[in-house]
Amino acid sequence: MGSEAMLPVALLIGYLLGSIPFGLILTKLAGTQDLRSIGSGNIGATNVLRTGRKGLAAATLLGDALKGTAAVIIAGYLGGSNAAMLAGLGAFLGHLFPVWLKFRGGKGVAVYIGILIGLLWPYAIFFCLVWLATAFASRYSSLAALVASVLTPIVLWAFGHTALAALFALLTLLLIYMHRENIKRLRAGTESKIGAKK
């Protein structure tokens, strides 16, 4: 299959991998309450942490990141760099809007990191360092994710990675949209801080 013909396949591969709801699967296997009825109702690692199962939350974070990385690596091997980037976009969309869960998924932070790892891993380290610094200073997980995701495409662009900067600018816009309720709570001063009980 030619590289051009591979592009829609890469998008589909990414979407299907991204649609795997690790948080929901792991919490069901562990016999906990339906994740969608806990806390924010989100299927990501932050909400899994609200079950009190730190191991499950870590496993969810890892699984969600790995599906982004796997999509990029598989598509890159089959169709090159453009296919890899499209697979990353597909994985992100799959996580946010999974077909298996009536298009109601997670917020995309772990998958964002996983895609960065697959495409240009040093920038995943940059993202995590910014996240940690912001989270330490503010105690807000959502704010840390927003700051790190906004800075990532700017830094990619500054170092000449224009195609990747464009991709991650799009992912950042989607991530901001998925955090719109968090942004409202941050502005109102009602957002939960890291370590706070809900």
UniProtKB/Swiss-Prot annotation:
TM annotation in the entry: 6-26, 56-78, 83-101, 113-133, 154-174
GO biological process: phospholipid biosynthetic process
Main location: membrane
Pfam entry (one): G3P_acyltransf
Pathway: Lipid metabolism; phospholipid metabolism
Superkingdom, natural source: Bacteria
This protein's UniProt keywords: Cell inner membrane, Cell membrane, Lipid biosynthesis, Lipid metabolism, Membrane, Phospholipid biosynthesis, Phospholipid metabolism, Transferase, Transmembrane, Transmembrane helix
Location(s), subcellular: Cell inner membrane
Catalysed reactions, semicolon-separated: an acyl phosphate + sn-glycerol 3-phosphate = a 1-acyl-sn-glycero-3-phosphate + phosphate
Membrane topology label: Multi-pass membrane protein
Listed GO CC annotations: plasma membrane
Record GO terms (molecular function): acyl-phosphate glycerol-3-phosphate acyltransferase activity
NCBIfam families reported in the protein's UniProt record: glycerol-3-phosphate 1-O-acyltransferase PlsY (TIGR00023)
Family: Belongs to the PlsY family.
Function text: Catalyzes the transfer of an acyl group from acyl-phosphate (acyl-PO(4)) to glycerol-3-phosphate (G3P) to form lysophosphatidic acid (LPA). This enzyme utilizes acyl-phosphate as fatty acyl donor, but not acyl-CoA or acyl-ACP.
Subunit composition and interactions: Probably interacts with PlsX.
PANTHER family, sorted: GLYCEROL-3-PHOSPHATE ACYLTRANSFERASE-RELATED (PTHR30309:SF0), INNER MEMBRANE PROTEIN YGIH (PTHR30309)
The protein's name: Glycerol-3-phosphate acyltransferase
Source organism: Bradyrhizobium sp. (strain ORS 278)
Lineage of source species: Bacteria, Pseudomonadati, Pseudomonadota, Alphaproteobacteria, Hyphomicrobiales
